[in-house]
Amino acid sequence: MSIHLGAKGEDIAPRVLLPGDPLRARFVAERFFHNAYCYNEVRGMLGFTGTYKGVRVSVQGTGMGLPSHSIYVTELFQDYGVQKAIRVGTAGGLQEEVALKSVVCALGAATDSAINARRFSGMHFAPTASWSLLRTAVSVADEMGTGVQVGNVISSDVFYDESGSWRLWARYGVLAVEMETAELYTLAAKFRREALSILTISDHLVTGAVTSAQERERSFTQMIEIALEAIIQ
């Protein structure tokens, strides 16, 4: 057991999907896993393990934002020996060509958070995806006929941002805004693990378009299928 996860060491698989929403973790387990069981209910942050196409895979909710994500990812890497982690979540589109409901694989992640500034004593670290996972996910998506867009995202500390700072990030070609990827990639680098963030565009800051609950579920399912196929390779 770790401080925030009530699992025994063998309860968590070496491959883990990371939705922010613990209810999405349950959805993944019920929809895609065979013989799924719940290994964590601490703080309501549900975690499940099962098999997908004969391979053991876990799914663990992480909450919203870099600090919460950091806690769970650190414990998964440090205390449970997780080797591959794929974040699956939603993001806001920052480019017109990144359509609503499309899937984005985050190549790199900028951030307005002070976490890395503190961690690296004011110096700047470039958090990037694991090439092997990224390449596999893109290949899987192409084979599925889905296709993904690959590029940088911005991991922000602020959800209700009235400053309009997203326009600056958009000017530099950043595809989407979300709240966790920069920390996932930084921790993967620290622990020498593989990590990738696969995101569904649920709303669009440029066009103002938003998805319905039903549309989010369908597009989320597509993203999960890509993530599962990639992580078992």
UniProtKB/Swiss-Prot annotation:
GO MF annotation, one: purine-nucleoside phosphorylase activity
GO biological process, any: purine nucleoside catabolic process
Reactions that this protein is recorded to catalyse: a purine D-ribonucleoside + phosphate = a purine nucleobase + alpha-D-ribose 1-phosphate; a purine 2'-deoxy-D-ribonucleoside + phosphate = a purine nucleobase + 2-deoxy-alpha-D-ribose 1-phosphate
Residues reported in the UniProt entry to bind a purine D-ribonucleoside: 4, 162, 178-180, 202-203
Binding-site positions, phosphate: 20, 24, 43, 87-90
Keyword Transferase: yes
EC number: 2.4.2.1
Keyword terms: Glycosyltransferase, Transferase
Site positions (Important for catalytic activity): 216
Active-site residues, Swiss-Prot/TrEMBL: 203 (proton donor)
Leading EC class: transferase
Positions in coiled-coil regions: none
GO cellular component: cytosol
Keyword Transferase found: yes
Protein function: Catalyzes the reversible phosphorolytic breakdown of the N-glycosidic bond in the beta-(deoxy)ribonucleoside molecules, with the formation of the corresponding free purine bases and pentose-1-phosphate.
Subunit structure as annotated in this protein's UniProt entry: Homohexamer; trimer of homodimers.
Similarity remark: Belongs to the PNP/UDP phosphorylase family.
NCBIfam families tied to this protein: deoD (TIGR00107), PRK05819.1 (NF004489)
Protein name from the UniProt record: Purine nucleoside phosphorylase DeoD-type
Organism: Treponema pallidum (strain Nichols)
Lineage: Bacteria, Pseudomonadati, Spirochaetota, Spirochaetia, Spirochaetales
Chain's gene name: deoD
